[in-house]
């Protein structure tokens, strides 16, 4: 079901000489709904902030997240998961294939988003990233979803699971 498991990871992106940012990504395994946020550092505090944003912006409740064993997903991040009632699954070291959906999503960000000229200031970059994600979640066809965008797929699944009226 939507929100049953969200994979989360970070990606270091070089925007130019001496300009790197930390890109936090999340993808729902059922709908492929994705969210991302950029920060200057990949530490527990930005990771916890990203999780809080995900909880608010996801169109369904988040029940569990899966992360690699990176230090950014310890302490503050673990506390936020516990406080929000979100199960946390931490993968063993050096097992990126177990986080394959978010790893693939990060490749999509590299290929489709980070190949264009982008601002190096975090607020402006986040605005561009949010616009890309809006397109990704609402309009971009996904082969794994039979050509639907994640939010189209979610709407279809919700319609199919809605109670049917038996009145004539």
Give residue spans per PLM region:
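Mobile-element integrase/transposase regions
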Residues: 1-27, 33, 46-49, 60-62, ...
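Short, conserved catalytic/metal-binding motifs centered on acidic residues
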Residues: 9, 32, 65-68, 99, ...
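RNase H-like polynucleotidyl transferase catalytic core
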Residues: 64-69, 83-101, 117-122
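Short small-residue beta-strand/loop micro-motif enriched in glycine and branched aliphatics
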Residues: 33-37, 89-91, 115
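C-terminal domain-tail junction helix/linker
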Residues: 2-4, 75, 84, 95, ...
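Acidic/histidine-rich, metal-coordinating catalytic segments
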Residues: 42, 60-75, 94, 148-151
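Phosphate/pyrophosphate-binding loops at sites that engage ATP/ADP/AMP, CoA/4′-phosphopantetheine
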Residues: 54-59
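Short amphipathic alpha-helical segments
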Residues: 77-79
